[in-house]
Amino acid sequence: MDGSTIVFILTMVCLFVYTVKHRGAKQVPSRTVQDAKPAPSVATNDPSPEPVPSAPEERVARLNRHGSDRKRAVNSDMVEIVMTMAPHVPQEKVVQDLRNTGSIEHTMENIFAGKLD
């Protein structure tokens, strides 16, 4: 082997050892957390106000009941997101549908269904 090849290989080995050594040093925690009892709270003693449904259909119905009935105010970010995904739809129609639905998801469903073309 050539002298420069040996120097290159030794340099690479040294860099590898240096990297492994410093990566291992960063993973050592500087502080240790002592085991402690959690403080009692009122929230842990109260039963949940609404039990978690077990069937997937009930979970979906619960999420739909709580999440999709609310309408959000239309802002420029919502319009920009819809326009990015569907640039062929006029912006006025997007804004109007966002005002009606209050949801990017519902507006996209309307676009896919062809209601805004």
Curated annotation (Swiss-Prot):
Major localisation: cytoplasm
Keyword Membrane: no
Region feature (Disordered): 27-74
Gene: CUE4
Comment on protein domains: The CUE domain binds ubiquitin, which may facilitate intramolecular monoubiquitination.
Position(s), cross-link Glycyl lysine isopeptide (Lys-Gly) (interchain with G-Cter in ubiquitin): 37
Taxonomic source organism: Saccharomyces cerevisiae (strain ATCC 204508 / S288c) (Baker's yeast)
Compositionally biased intervals (Basic and acidic residues): 56-74
Claim: Ubl conjugation is one of the keywords in the record: yes
Single GO cellular component term: cytoplasm
Domain CUE: 74-116
The name this protein goes by in its record: CUE domain-containing protein CUE4
Record-linked InterPro entries: CUE (IPR003892)
Post-translational modification: Ubiquitinated.
